Amino acid sequence: MSVSYNRVIVAFCEGQHDVAFLSRILLVNGFLLQDLKIGQLPPPFDKRFEKELSQVRIPDKKLGFQPNGPKLPSVCFYNDGNLIFIHNLNGDGRGRERVELVTMYKELSGTDDFSIEIAYRFLYFFDADELGIDARITEIKNEIGLEEATQLSNGSIIDFDGSEWGGYIFHDVQTQLGTLEDQLLGYFYNKNQQLQQDILSFLQTNVLIQERTRRFISSNAGESYSGRSQYYEKKSVLGMYAQLQFSGVSNAVLISNTDFLKAVDINRC
């Protein structure tokens, strides 16, 4: 990677849906996806990420494990001196992992003759869920270590401890609660209201008993259901859109490629 950077933006996401949505936003705003091998990333990140991979104890892993854990970014973007790394934390309750990532990045910056001084911006992306926007913002403030009186609003950026910090909470516009799926389905609904109503009608007409939405285990020892219900109506609605456009793909692939989400929607976020 031959480009030079003057600021590194690190985004922490709950899941792959968030990564896909943020990637759409960045592409619309002129950022370029850096489809690079780890060794092609600019220093000092190339060596740092190589080190993270080298520390994976392969013999301790089971077949099918994914080596690129949260300490390796899912994607990298660049535009006008801004280098962006987006991390998928696989859940909101990953405070320890986020703190470790902040520490990892900050350790790469220094002011001596042998170090590179790096200007960082750390961004946190969460769903409001049933907690609401204010409660999520408070969680971010506590994790960063901000004093209670420090003002941090949804979508704002502040300076603290030598870096910039901010967060955005995905939510339903009407209730101020909910998830990224609520925002996406709002955009999709505006494109074709009848289609979304038909999808909801199909799902609600054919709803299964809750037991059948749990993991089903079938072996020579017998058959049984395990764990909690895995049915979430909003995710299923997105899944129906996905199958109408791109058979067999995940919701994250839908978010990355669908024309139910256009630049005009993204620019209104």
Can you describe what each PLM-predicted range is?
Residues 117-254, 259:
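Activity-critical C-terminal alpha-helical subdomain
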Residues 1-107, 143:
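Domain-level signal for Mg2+-assisted phosphodiester chemistry and nucleotide/NA-binding surfaces
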Residues 2, 106-118, 157-158:
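Surface-exposed acidic, glycine-flexible loop patches that form ligand/cofactor-binding
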Residues 30, 37-39, 109-113, 192, ...:
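Short, flexible coil/linker elements and helix-boundary hinge sites characteristic
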